[in-house]
């Protein structure tokens, strides 16, 4: 995604994710939400996941180190995560969704973020596979003309002594090496979460990451940047703390659980060119992403060459570009041996070209059409279209709507016949066999939104959406043994297992819903923002036809109240409600619903000096208990947060 050189303002939010280039958020051909730098500062968000909890249509699944982002009823695997428009994807080193939330751990510290842009709904016409549910784009601060920086540190202390405390520090620094020619910026972040003393609770987690960007500006029209990024995560679960010490019985033998320690490493290199000319804007980047899971001997590399170029002529803004990608995976976990040979390395190449034109037919109406052609060496070609209109009948109303397609290619292991991935969570010995006949998953999304703003102190919006999902890849059990783990009654090529599965395209599903937003500047110093989301999912085929698809609450309500009590003191309050979820499809069977819950948070921000920010907050004020037994996950009870930020 190209980066805007314009500063964020309250009057005109500028976004780049919807079309690839800077435009006003209200005119973007997508349902898009912006979390501005002011929001990040005044609401004292702890990390990116915390900020996304207030976005309509977004569900933060799991908790703590296992948080994942789902949009509009689609699972977290269908949400594309970007940092400055560049893809972040390490799912290849955590098969079967082990240790959810890894991608969130790669995000930069809050102090380095300029804004966050969220597209709700498919964006495959522009971004390709993985953007089937939506896109989260983290826009970081740019290289400064004069030396500046900030450091932010905070601590979260649990009211319950059984819960683990969290400590984190983030640093951002930027400035010129050669004035107006060469600049540098960098970030560093350290976060440590202590392990809970609750069975099924939060694991101990330590995250360390940093990046360095050299920015060369030979003239006003061109910028060349080279970036190196390194991130490390470690997770530790201890028997008797978060792991149940009770032994399991298999064939009359006791098996005792053991401690779990998992490390994840990510390294990224990128070279980017941006050009800004009178009627032509361009961005091209080459990126290499390396993801490592040494505890499971998995190593993944993703190499991407991407270009976007926008031409403006007459009433048109034409965006054309392309992408080439190579995926490589080294994994010693293959359980299948064919002819005495075990496949441990997988590779796949793909490329795409796309074009998108915004045609302003009349001053009040713009029509955007997109077309993307993808070529995959395993799946052949795929065409992804989009047609979207934006109508502004007057200066208070905007009506937007359109139809867009989405698609997602199968993961490397899932699409390889000679691959058998171990599974079973350590209790059962199971295997998932790859299937080269898998087809990409596809969706058709229709949405219509009405947005009103009196350009003074009131704004409201209402969006209707419907997504038809087909060729969903589902794990189907081809052999199921008895209920006693370790009996190994299923056979495959001379090997014995408790169960054997294969992934197949079997299901169709529908996701539909309503998103409503309301913003009211009650007084010059008092702001109220609220949003409500209704989501309904239904499987249209397969063994569970008529049943819900995902573990999503049907009703979500978020509201925040901000009061600037004094020029140096502001207070905030937040309420997040999640209704009872429906029963949902887990990997191979329907799972029970989980109860509703409501969290209330509140805090203060005090600025004794322009360069100093002091924050304090109470999260889950009423100490609502969300535990593994009733909810399938553990969320923190009441906790207290204090923070300090210094900007120079």
Features from the language model and the residues they span:
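Extracytoplasmic beta-strand/coil segments of soluble accessory domains associated
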Residues: 49-90, 114
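Short acidic/polar hinge/loop motifs at secondary-structure boundaries
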Residues: 88-120
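Surface-exposed extracellular loop regions of Gram-negative outer-membrane beta-barrel proteins
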Residues: 87, 92, 242-245, 328-335, ...
């Amino acid at each position: 995604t190209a980066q805007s050189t314009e500063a964020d303002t309250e009057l005109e939010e500028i976004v780049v994710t919807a079309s690839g280039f800077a435009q006003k958020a209200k005119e973007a051909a997508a349902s898009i939400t912006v979390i501005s730098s002011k929001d990040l500062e005044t609401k004292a968000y702890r990390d990116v996941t915390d900020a996304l909890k207030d976005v309509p249509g977004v569900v933060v699944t799991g908790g703590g180190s296992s948080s994942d982002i789902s949009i509009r009823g689609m699972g977290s695997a269908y949400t594309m995560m970007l940092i400055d428009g560049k893809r972040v994807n390490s799912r290849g080193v955590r098969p079967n969704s082990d240790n959810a939330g890894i991608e969130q751990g790669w995000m930069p510290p809050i102090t380095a973020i300029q804004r966050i842009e969220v597209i709700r709904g498919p964006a495959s016409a522009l971004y390709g596979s993985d953007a089937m549910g939506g896109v989260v784009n983290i826009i970081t601060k740019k290289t400064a003309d004069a030396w500046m920086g900030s450091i932010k540190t905070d601590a979260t202390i649990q009211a319950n002594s059984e819960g683990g405390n969290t400590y984190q520090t983030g640093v951002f620094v930027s400035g010129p090496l050669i004035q107006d020619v060469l600049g540098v910026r960098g970030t560093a972040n350290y976060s440590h979460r202590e392990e809970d003393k609750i069975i099924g609770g939060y694991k101990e987690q330590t995250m360390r990451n940093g990046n360095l960007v050299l920015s060369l500006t030979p003239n006003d029209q061109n910028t060349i940047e080279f970036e190196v990024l390194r991130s490390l995560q470690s997770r530790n679960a201890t028997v008797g703390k978060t792991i149940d010490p009770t032994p399991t019985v298999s064939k009359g033998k006791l098996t005792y659980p053991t401690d779990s320690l998992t490390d994840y490493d990510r390294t990224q290199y990128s070279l980017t060119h941006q050009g800004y000319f009178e009627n032509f804007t361009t961005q091209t980047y080459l990126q290499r992403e390396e993801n490592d899971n040494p505890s499971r001997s998995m190593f993944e590399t993703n190499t991407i060459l991407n270009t976007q170029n926008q031409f403006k002529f007459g009433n048109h803004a034409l965006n054309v570009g392309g992408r080439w990608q190579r995926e490589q995976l080294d994994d010693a976990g293959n359980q299948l041996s064919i002819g005495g040979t075990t496949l441990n390395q997988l590779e796949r190449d793909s490329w795409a070209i796309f074009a998108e034109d915004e045609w302003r037919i009349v001053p009040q109406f713009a029509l955007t059409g997109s077309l993307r052609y993808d070529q995959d060496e395993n799946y052949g070609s795929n065409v992804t279209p989009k047609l979207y209109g934006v109508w502004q009948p007057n200066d208070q109303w905007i009506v937007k709507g359109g139809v867009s397609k989405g698609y997602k290619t199968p993961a490397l292991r899932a699409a390889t016949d000679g691959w058998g991935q171990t599974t079973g969570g350590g209790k059962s010995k199971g295997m998932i066999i790859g299937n080269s006949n898998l087809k990409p998953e596809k969706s058709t999304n229709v949405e219509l939104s009405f947005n009103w703003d009196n350009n003074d102190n009131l704004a409201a919006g209402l969006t209707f959406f419907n997504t038809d999902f087909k060729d969903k890849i589902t794990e189907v059990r081809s052999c199921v043994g008895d209920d006693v783990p370790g009996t190994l009654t299923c056979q495959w090529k001379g090997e014995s297992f408790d169960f054997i599965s294969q992934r197949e395209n079997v299901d169709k599903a529908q996701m539909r819903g309503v998103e409503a937003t309301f913003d009211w500047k009650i007084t010059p110093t008092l702001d109220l923002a609220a949003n409500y989301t209704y989501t309904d999912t239904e499987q249209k085929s397969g063994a569970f036809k008529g049943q819900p698809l995902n573990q999503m609450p049907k009703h979500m309500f978020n509201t925040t109240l901000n009061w600037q009590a004094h020029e140096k003191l502001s207070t905030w309050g937040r309420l997040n409600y999640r209704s009872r979820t429906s029963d949902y499809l887990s990997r191979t069977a329907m799972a029970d619903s989980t109860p509703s819950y409501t969290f209330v948070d509140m805090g203060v921000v005090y600025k004794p000096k322009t360069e100093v920010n002091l924050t304090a907050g109470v999260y889950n004020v009423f100490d609502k208990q969300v535990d593994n037994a009733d909810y399938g996950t553990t969320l923190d009870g009441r906790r207290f947060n204090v923070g300090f930020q210094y900007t120079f």
